Amino acid sequence: MASPAPLTVERLGFAWPNGRTALNHCSFQIPKSGLWMLVGSNGSGKSTLLRLIAGLLTPRSGQIHTPLKAALVFQNPDHQLLLPSCSSELLLALPEGLSSSERSDRIHTALEQVGLSGLAQRSIHTLSGGQKQRLAIAGALASEASLLLLDEPTALLDPSSQADALELVHQLSHRTEQPLTALWITHRLEELQRCDGAAVMEEGHMGPWQSGQALIQQLAGQLAPLQSGRAEG
């Protein structure tokens, strides 16, 4: 028997209190684990979609189906890192009912998975931006989430930290045992080269999945006339 799709969204609709529609009959499916990316202009509904999947917002219509626990990773990790040390931050994410040794083991494993071994007692304010983003991902892993929702996680990082964060999520979503499913919003077209599928969101609708390289070429073709016009003008 085939495993259920990690995520299925059916005719999802959402409007803000001011009446502005953010999503309108948005439907798509992530067919398997891996790294899946969304691009789109500001206001196209990308971030709203992630918050609906994470359960932070309630849809006006439609359904979300997933057998996985979801966790949202924000653009700015300072918005979700609340406690003074790495270990105390991860304690917030752990399931209830664990023994002291189980909590310690879970924290150690989560930090090891994101390349932060040995930093359990490190003060969060001493971490670099890239390390903070890794810690935010470690919190998702410690919570036993296997559906990562990443809202432009590299937007505030330097190029080296950006590449490291992308490689980390790529590895976690392609590991042999229990690979994660990651839905990643980006404005950096070069990041699409690492994904298993990419799609464009426009006016609350999501287009079909295609390869990252194909989408790069499509978007480059759309931008070329605009750039040419600016040069001529």
Please report, for each region that a protein language model flagged, where it lies by residue.
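A short, flexible loop at the N-terminus of ABC-type nucleotide-binding domains that lies
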Residues: M1-H25
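Catalytic Walker B motif of ABC-type/P-loop ATPase nucleotide-binding domains
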Residues: L148-E152
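Helix-to-loop junction immediately C-terminal to a conserved catalytic motif
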Residues: A54
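Conserved ABC ATPase "signature" region
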Residues: S101-L119
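The feature captures the beta-strand-to-loop junction immediately N-terminal to the Walker
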Residues: V39-S41
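Conserved ABC ATPase signature
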Residues: S123-L127, Q131
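Conserved beta-strand-loop-alpha-helix hinge in the C-terminal portion
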Residues: H205-E232
